[in-house]
Amino acid sequence: MAQRSNRFLTGLIAAVAAVLMAASGAMAAVVIGNGSSNVLTGTPQRDVILGRAGDDTINALAGADLVRAGRGADSVNAGQGPDRVRGGDGDDALNGDRGPDFMRGGLGADAINGERGRDFISGGKGDDTLSGGVRRDVIFANRGRDHSDGGDGNDVLWALSRFDVDFIGDPNGDELTGAAGNDRFRVRDGEVDLVHCGEGIDHVRADQFDQVDNDCEHVDRRDITSLDQVEDGDENRVEPGS
């Protein structure tokens, strides 16, 4: 049964690689790990890389790669191309690069970092830590109790589930949207941020000029006249509608 499953998996990956080669016109390598902890490295072309049972290190290079972590605690480093990266069953670390990457967590408590590209980042089923990079990123907190940090760009942060989510803005003006959980928003960054809380009992720490929806139950505002005051000074508590 195991051999038949392995043959099916290998055939499936080869079929995906054939689709990628047909779409790109470039040769794609198929790199598959085994039950050990492997170092799996792609090529400058469009690759398919699949981790297996070990704690793998996966290095995608310059192509538009398709990467899937396996059952171990894997570390994935996307390359300079526009990569699609998916976490596996373990607590994985997924890191983007210069390309506009699509990265999604798996079953574990994953750490996903967008780095230098314009990235689409989505949490998985675990309690994930989601971080954008220096560009404008879109971040979705998914099924776990996630921690979302926009990074340096003008980012869009969303919650998609009933779980509680921590949102952190950055000094570039972000849009943050909660869902059904009891979410916490921290946007004291000296820029104009947009906060949409959604359902649940939500808490917002905002600057005086941030635009905070009336469905946010608890809002703490502070007048900011310089960035030096973002973490210092007295707080003012403002209820919705005031």
Residue ranges: model-predicted function:
Residues A2-I13:
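Bacterial N-terminal signal peptides that target proteins for export
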Residues A2-R4, M21, M27:
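Charge-rich, low-hydrophobicity low-complexity segments
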Residues G11-A22:
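Bacterial N-terminal signal peptides
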Residues A26-L66, Q229-R237, G241:
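N-terminal segments that cap or nucleate solenoid repeat domains
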Residues G33, G42, G51, A60, ...:
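Glycine-centered beta-turn/loop sites at beta-strand termini
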Residues S37, R46, D55, A64, ...:
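Consensus positions within tandem repeat domains that build extended binding/scaffold surfaces
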Residues G63, D149-G150, D174-D183, H196-H203, ...:
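Beta-strand repeat architectures
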Residues V187-V230:
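Leucine-rich solenoid repeat scaffolds
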